[in-house]
C-alpha cells in the first residue's frame, strides 16, 4: 500500500512504546533519525542474534521516560517520510519545534540512525 506523504500533522493522542517508537492513535511511528536502546522485552536482545541491537536496558528505560516527558510538553507533530520494513511510519517527531530524535541524541539516550 503506498504511503501518502504530507506536511507535519498533529498527533492527538501520542503514546510512547520505547525511545524511538511512538503511537499516534493506531499508527505506529518510528522516529526516523535515531536508534534508541532496547527495552527488556525486545526480541532483538532476547535471542542475541542481532549484533547491532543496543541492549542496555537501563538506558532503554531512560530513553523511553525522556521521550514521554518531551512529548508531554506540548503539541506533538509528525512529518511522515515513508515506512520501515516492519510497516511502521518513518517520521520526524517534534514538540514545540524541538526535534525528538535530536533531543534524545543530545541527552546521550539515542544514537544517529544510519
Residue ranges and their predicted role:
Residues 2-114:
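Small beta-barrel nucleic-acid-binding modules, primarily SNase/OB-fold domains
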Amino acid at each position: 500500500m503506498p504511503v501518502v506523504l504530507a506536511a507535519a500533522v498533529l498527533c492527538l493522542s501520542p503514546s510512547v512504546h520505547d525511545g524511538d517508537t511512538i503511537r499516534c492513535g493506531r499508527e505506529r511511528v518510528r522516529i526516523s533519525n535515531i536508534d534508541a536502546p532496547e527495552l527488556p522485552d525486545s526480541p532483538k536482545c532476547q535471542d542475541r542474534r542481532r549484533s547491532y541491537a543496543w541492549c542496555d536496558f537501563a538506558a532503554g528505560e531512560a530513553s523511553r521516560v525522556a521521550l514521554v516527558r518531551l512529548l508531554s510538553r506540548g503539541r506533538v507533530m509528525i512529518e511522515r517520510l515513508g515506512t520501515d520494513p516492519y510497516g511502521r511510519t518513518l517520521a520526524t517527531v517534534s514538540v514545540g519545534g524541538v526535534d525528538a530524535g535530536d533531543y534524545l541524541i543530545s541527552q546521550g539516550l539515542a544514537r544517529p540512525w544510519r
